[in-house]
Amino acid sequence: MGPAGAKTNPAWAGIVAGSLLLVVSCWFAAAPKSVKASSEADEAAAARLAYSEKTAAKYNFRYGKEFPFLPSNATTDNGQFINPKSFYTADYCGHCHKESHDQWRQSAHSNSNRVPYYLKNVELLNVEKGIEFSRHCEGCHDPIAVVSGALTQGAPKKRPYDQDGVTCSVCHSIQQGDTRGTGSYVMGVPAVMVDEEGKPISRPVSDGEILAHLDRHSKAVMRDFYRTSEFCSSCHKAALPKALNDFKWQRAISLYDEWQASSFAKQSPLPFYVKDSVSTCQTCHMQREALKTSDYGAKKNQLASHRWLGANTVIPKIYGFDEQAARVVEFLKNSVFNIDIFALEHGDTEDSAKWQDVAAPLGLVSFKTAAGDVLTADVVIQNKGIAHSHVPEQRDMYESWVEFAVKDANGRVLTQSGAIEGGGELDARAHSFTNRLINVKGELNNLHQVWNNRVVAYNNTIQAGRSQLVRYAFQIPAGTTGSVSITATVKYRRFNQHFMDFGMGKHYEMPIVDMASQTRVVNIGENKPVTPGPLENKEWMRWNNYGIALLDAQQYAASVHAFERVAQMRSDYADAFTNIAIAQFQWEKYGDAHGNLEKALALAPTSARTLYYRALVERNEGHLDLAIGDLETVVKSFPRSRDAHRELGFSYYQQHKYELARTEYETLQSIDPDDLAAHYNLSILYRRLGAKDKAAQQAAMFADQKDDPMASTYALEYLRQHTELANESVVWHVHELNVPAITQAAAPVSAGGLH
């Protein structure tokens, strides 16, 4: 295949092809007519048992011999340990899969267990609680160490396979998995070929054998579920179990759940927008790309990318992976967000009962400003390109925020929010997509000590397909002439500076990526409509996103008004009326909601989204039969809608149809094993149906997984001491910049206040 790093050319390819033909031909001549598969399998099983028993003799079975891998959910095919030498190295796979190997080497998977910041964080856990607790992390960061029994007292701290992290033979040896996450996979002994009977061959296999039986190689290393999001959920979903924190179960990462409920999955009727086709994790993170070197896994000269492009900009910098760095930045900038500086609210807000004068949508209406004016900019940020939340996962150490700046005509900054301050720290009052994890002492877990979590004091993110409204109040200084520019930018860097400096053992500067940005110029004096830019949404969608953002900010009256503007512009758009009804339903105006749902159904009689919300209204009105009929229709159209199954199960329960209710909640658990409502209701249903053992099991799971009602006291005390975060934790707040202290408005708009 040529010297390492060499690009394939026709002459070299011919030499390679001839050499391979010779190798394969010689192997065929030397190969025995039959293989003693049974004896090989017996020998392999005996060797594995011997290794497992030897390992078990010195292993810390903290959670009992029946749960050797806790606090990870990982397990092996027969419960025995697997010799780490059974795992083929990535270099071995690279013989034939050069390009996949080269891409993998630069990926987060490859470096999952060797980057300094991860090792420092795990060492905190090892010192504080013991190495056996680190199985919780290593089940996904270093699976070979977990299933080989290496994470116990007295075992070597440095292992050769650590440098490969999640290597080829890890993912391609997983036999099955489920959506509990935290390493919820079943690992088998790696094999790169199966025999004539389809049984794995665990002995070393030559390249020639593989090339002679590519079909048997494929059967050994590929499974259909590797192409599903459920496969990824084994690690890209996680919880903090009692076995780790000595407290109770807490959700940590819910990427799979977020995807499954989004429009990208097309498994739920509830998203605000509809995608044309299904996108899985692999669709975005393993896009097919043109082959550059050589790889026998390529099809039609294209290869499923093994870079797993995401958001880690630090690994490429640490190891000098320039191509990966450029590709990650490109990925982060690829139409993930739409930023819309949607409105300007004129006047101060000292009188909270006063409806403000609002110019919206900016660029399409005329308005006036003057030097000395106090303005509040309404910035709408739409998550249109991510199939999960931004920022995803635990969020405590990741850092993404909104930078907002007002400049005069000469480019001088008049006021701003979200600047990087001395030492690399972010402005503490910036609007950030992050959270705050609080421990039992009411203190911040600022080094990702998730094993000490008790409560999340603050949690801000934008889910897939949703929008968020960020408001900034500022004053145009007296004497300003010409114009001012207003710029809003979503920025991203991998970690906050405090965690990164800890992780690297020194101050370490990280790349900062501008994911999306918009600038609007406001004239001092008259402002007239302008031609929309190429990246701007259509007017109806701008109003729609504004309405979604207001809805999530619990500003129901304003949200209804925004959605009504959509209905005026698109009278044939059924979801406009459904959206009005959703806001009215949350506002507890059930009669009004019902009327708008009927308008929507007149336009789209089979809309599962509208039928779902009509069912909720009907049930609230006491019409259970009608509600059940609508929900049954929804479930037929969306059999994996967790919301529909949950509500249908409760409706059956209200009618004492316990068997039907049980079926719905069991179906719900097949989609989400940790659904809290399913645990609670099944604990009641099983008891009423005489299944007392199952009832007790579900009751115990509910008790473990429900939030601790007293934990909020830690959060309240922390917020009391951190006023900058207390303000951020209020869903409807204003970032007050260069203006005197003001009282926030009761609402942003009124029917008569908009231009």
Region spans (language model):
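TPR/TPR-like (Sel1-like) alpha-helical repeat modules
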Residues: 666, 670, 676, 680-711
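Helix-start (N-cap) detector for alpha-helical repeat units in TPR-like alpha-solenoids
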Residues: 540, 574-575, 608-609, 642-643, ...
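Structural marker of alpha-solenoid helical repeat scaffolds
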Residues: 569, 603, 637-638, 670-671, ...
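Primarily the internal scaffold of c-type cytochrome electron-transfer domains
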Residues: 36-84, 100-133, 149-464, 471-480, ...
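Alpha-helical linker/edge segments of TPR/alpha-solenoid repeat scaffolds
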Residues: 690-698, 707-713, 721-739
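Structural signature of tandem alpha-helical TPR/SEL1-like repeats
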Residues: 553-565, 572, 586-599, 606-609, ...
